[in-house]
């Protein structure tokens, strides 16, 4: 049994593990989905050092928790280190993540960079901070991954994030793209992985609640969520209520692309189709006879 450790904010840094059957069913489901994602996309290999980006939100806590469980039972050896970027947002509880990591014996780093001030300066008035903030955050974390010799950078995006990004690009960006489960960073120095790619957000919410993670709010900066993404997230939630299989089908479509059925000339060579056409009659004379017969039949009609 774990002994609870309380903070001044009321957080429980080392809660007792749930014992309900609902918890174990959910845990089994999450392990299966994360395991399949890791296997399908070869996310983690023997000898890897996986840097898990932890913000203090439900997604990153769940990701870290499941990966730590895999580390204990996996047939391969790999290391996990948690990294949080303290962006110096006003009101950010700086003691929460260090306490949680230490109480649970998790190797971690706290990277301190005042990106909040830079974000405020670079963001036009009336706009949300999210775009600039995420760009600065990515740059800081990816650079730090190189410093500590991480071979993989694990991010907490889940299935619903991937689908929302797909529609965001479709509706507002004029492109068919989402968040890939595995990606080479633009500077080609980091491999990014999303082990929660198959996991639904509603299951993460349930799991985080059952595990009683010390959740840190994501809106401490005072900025509101990007309006377009907020509307898409609401649309997806409504779809999930009314048509439970729809999101599953959409995510399946992202794994079942037919380039020849789209209109991207860089993705498919449409010019080669003429040379690939197979005709039933290779003898020109035979072809002419058949065409004459067809023409006569039209004339008779």
From Swiss-Prot:
The record's listing under Pfam families reads: ATP_bind_3
Listed EC numbers: 2.8.1.-
- Choose any GO biological process term that the UniProt entry carries and state it: tRNA thio-modification
Name the CDD domains on file: TtcA-like
Which terms in the Gene Ontology molecular function aspect does this entry carry? 4 iron, 4 sulfur cluster binding; ATP binding; magnesium ion binding; sulfurtransferase activity; tRNA binding
Keywords attached to this entry: 4Fe-4S, ATP-binding, Cytoplasm, Iron, Iron-sulfur, Magnesium, Metal-binding, Nucleotide-binding, RNA-binding, Transferase, tRNA processing, tRNA-binding
* Reaction equation(s) it catalyzes: cytidine(32) in tRNA + S-sulfanyl-L-cysteinyl-[cysteine desulfurase] + AH2 + ATP = 2-thiocytidine(32) in tRNA + L-cysteinyl-[cysteine desulfurase] + A + AMP + diphosphate + H(+)
Cofactor(s) the protein needs: Mg(2+); [4Fe-4S] cluster
Please tell me whether the keyword tRNA-binding is annotated for this protein. yes
Q: Which domain of life is it from?
A: Bacteria
Q: Which residues bind [4Fe-4S] cluster?
A: 130, 133, 221
How far does the signal peptide extend, from start to end residue?
none
**Which Gene Ontology CC terms are recorded?**
cytoplasm
What positions does the record give for the motif labelled PP-loop motif?
A: 55-60
Localization, per the record, is:
Cytoplasm
Tell me, in a sentence or two, what this protein's role is: Catalyzes the ATP-dependent 2-thiolation of cytidine in position 32 of tRNA, to form 2-thiocytidine (s(2)C32). The sulfur atoms are provided by the cysteine/cysteine desulfurase (IscS) system.
Subunit info here reads:
Homodimer.
Family note: Belongs to the TtcA family.
Q: Mention any additional remark.
A: The thiolation reaction likely consists of two steps: a first activation step by ATP to form an adenylated intermediate of the target base of tRNA, and a second nucleophilic substitution step of the sulfur (S) atom supplied by the hydrosulfide attached to the Fe-S cluster.
Name recorded for this polypeptide: tRNA-cytidine(32) 2-sulfurtransferase
Task: List the source organism.
Answer: Acinetobacter baylyi (strain ATCC 33305 / BD413 / ADP1)
Corresponding gene?
ttcA
């Amino acid at each position: 049994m774990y002994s609870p450790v309380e903070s001044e904010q009321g957080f429980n840094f080392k809660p007792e593990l749930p014992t309900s059957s609902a918890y174990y069913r959910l845990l089994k489901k999450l392990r299966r989905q994360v395991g399949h994602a890791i296997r399908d996309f070869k996310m983690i290999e023997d000898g890897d050092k996986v840097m898990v980006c932890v913000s203090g939100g439900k997604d990153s806590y769940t990701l870290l928790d499941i990966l730590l469980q895999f580390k204990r039972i996996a047939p391969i050896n790999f290391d996990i280190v948690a990294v949080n970027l303290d962006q110096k947002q006003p009101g950010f509880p700086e003691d929460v993540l260090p306490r949680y990591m230490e109480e649970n014996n998790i190797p971690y780093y706290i990277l301190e960079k005042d990106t909040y001030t830079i974000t405020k300066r670079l963001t036009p008035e009336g706009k949300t901070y999210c775009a600039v903030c995420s760009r600065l955050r990515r740059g800081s974390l990816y650079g730090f991954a190189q410093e500590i010799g991480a071979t993989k950078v694990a991010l907490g995006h889940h299935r619903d994030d991937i689908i929302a990004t797909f529609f965001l690009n479709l509706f507002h960006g004029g492109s068919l793209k989402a968040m890939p489960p595995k990606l080479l960073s633009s500077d080609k120095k980091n491999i990014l992985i999303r082990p929660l790619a198959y996991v639904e957000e509603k299951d993460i919410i349930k799991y985080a609640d059952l595990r009683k993670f010390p959740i840190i709010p994501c809106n401490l900066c005072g900025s509101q969520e990007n309006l377009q993404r907020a509307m898409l997230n609401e649309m997806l939630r409504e779809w999930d209520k009314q048509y439970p299989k729809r999101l599953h089908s959409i995510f399946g479509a992202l794994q079942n692309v037919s380039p020849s059925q789209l209109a991207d000339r860089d993705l498919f060579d449409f010019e080669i189709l003429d040379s690939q056409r197979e005709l039933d009659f290779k003898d020109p004379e035979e072809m002419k006879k058949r065409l004459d017969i067809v023409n006569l039949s039209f004339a008779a009609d």
